[in-house]
Amino acid sequence: MVNMETCAMDCCVLKALLAERAHKCLILDCRSFFSFSSCSIVGSSNVRLSTIVKRRAKGSMGLEHIVPNEEQRCRLVAGMYEAVVLLDERTSELDMLRKDSTMMLAVNALCRDSRGSSIYFLKGGYETFSAQCPEFCTKNSPPVGLSLPLCANNVPGSADSNCTPCGTPLYDQGGPVEILPFLYLGSAYHASRKDMLDTLGITALINVSANCPNHFEGHFQYKSIPVEDSHKADISSWFNEAIDFIDSVKNSGGRVFVHCQAGISRSATICLAYLMRTNRVKLDEAFEFVKQRRSIISPNFSFMGQLLQFESQVLAPSCSAEAGSPTISVLDRGTSTTTVFNFPVSIPVHSGANSLSYLQNPITTSPSC
């Protein structure tokens, strides 16, 4: 049953609130992370409830899941918001929603736990609001990378003066792509192009390889993750360090470029782990989000398996800050055990990776990236 304290708010009313008293209004967007990241109302926050969290909550969701930002949650509990407005894609009546939908769970939690704030849902959702009030919305089209010349001839700071456009591998074409405003993904070639990095405002690089050089150590901050693109490699033990590094650069106002040799497997894995942890999303959602920006990403079987294990830890209600360094990792450093994952089901095997070509995988993986 819908809580009667929740009323519909027309788009024109929200527009007036944002124009006059935006600091008194908390907007909670209940759409998927992918939809929210592509376009959203200015100043809104995304409510992300995983299937695991929903199932374990049994209809009674804690406020910490609805408003993960601690500062906003404290302001809400203290009654400092006049209005809390929830929205999804296009709902016009709350009675149309399932009881276990993200917005209904959020409505019930807010009506139960908020203090002194009126709870509303936006009539017509983001679809209607963006059509009527586009000036209060942000829209981020999937970046396609830089349109810079492929040849590094005569480019100051270039590490390679002999490249030619002819025969340039696909993974080196174009430029680094924006995953988030402070996070970029690309190849070792891109990492050797100081002009590209400077154009993007890059201040730090994560080098996810054991043999790619750090070309400009006097100019950029570097973080090295010496992992081979191998089914025996343990990349998950580096997730926490990489995530902390990205966050530290972000918090200082900088931008991070993550690369391996081709920008397909190892560096993509790090970006996926970052999205999963910081946005509490499933692997398939993070994968689709990154693939929209760099279509050739293809983490190897083992890395996909480690990401799946990471997903179960990230989305568990009791997950801790140590989730990126599990007590029992998929592959222990230094061991020779091989585990191949037929996404999304893990299959431990004892034969060599080369003998497993018969395994079919809906997500193409690359043997060497």
Swiss-Prot record:
Dual specificity phosphatase that dephosphorylates MAP kinase MAPK1/ERK2 on both 'Thr-188' and 'Tyr-190', regulating its activity during the meiotic cell cycle. The lineage of its organism: Eukaryota, Metazoa, Chordata, Craniata, Vertebrata. One of its GO terms (molecular function) is protein serine/threonine phosphatase activity. It comes from the Eukaryota. The active site is at C260. Phosphorylated by MAPK1/ERK2 at Thr-168 and at one or more serine residues in a progesterone-dependent manner. Phosphorylation reduces its rate of degradation but does not seem to affect phosphatase activity. It is found in: Nucleus. Induction: By serum stimulation, heat shock and oxidative stress. One of its GO terms (cellular component) is nucleus. The keyword Phosphoprotein applies. Its main location: nucleus. This is Dual specificity protein phosphatase 1-A. It catalyses: O-phospho-L-seryl-[protein] + H2O = L-seryl-[protein] + phosphate; O-phospho-L-threonyl-[protein] + H2O = L-threonyl-[protein] + phosphate; O-phospho-L-tyrosyl-[protein] + H2O = L-tyrosyl-[protein] + phosphate.
